[in-house]
Amino acid sequence: MTANVSGIGSVLQQMQSMAAQASGGVASPTAALAGSGAATAGTFASAMKASLDKISGDQQHALGEAKAFEVGAPNISLNDVMVDMQKANIGFQFGLQVRNKLVSAYNDIMQMSV
């Protein structure tokens, strides 16, 4: 969850720097890319990858527990399976909403006149 929060924080920081550059009248697009946006691109990409890996890991763990419960593993209870499935679902929905916000922000930026 901490990786998700830090990932969102980096997205917000990048969006704020883009807004500041847009309102400040950056001379050229290459100057904007050479600024802080390019420096945080690696950080943003690594945060997104870490978030997606965690979501995938949670889903794989929940599916593994469900399969173990189905075959009758004695140390897995139905409560554990249900809680882990819901955690994986919430993580997936969170990732989906982050993706939707990023796509929406991208579309807004692309529709801006130069």
Swiss-Prot record:
Q: Which InterPro entries match?
A: FliE
Report the principal subcellular site.
other
Write one Pfam family the protein is assigned to.
FliE
Please, which domain of life does this record's source organism belong to?
Bacteria
Which GO molecular function, any one, fits this protein according to its record?
structural molecule activity
Q: Which one GO biological process term can you cite for this protein?
A: bacterial-type flagellum-dependent cell motility
Cellular component, GO, one term: bacterial-type flagellum basal body
**Signal sequence extent:** none
Q: Could you tell me the keywords of this UniProt record?
A: Bacterial flagellum
Q: Give the subcellular location.
A: Bacterial flagellum basal body
Cited NCBIfam families? fliE
Q: Which family does it belong to?
A: Belongs to the FliE family.
For this entry, the protein name equals: Flagellar hook-basal body complex protein FliE
Q: Which organism is it from?
A: Burkholderia cenocepacia (strain ATCC BAA-245 / DSM 16553 / LMG 16656 / NCTC 13227 / J2315 / CF5610) (Burkholderia cepacia (strain J2315))
Gene that encodes it: fliE
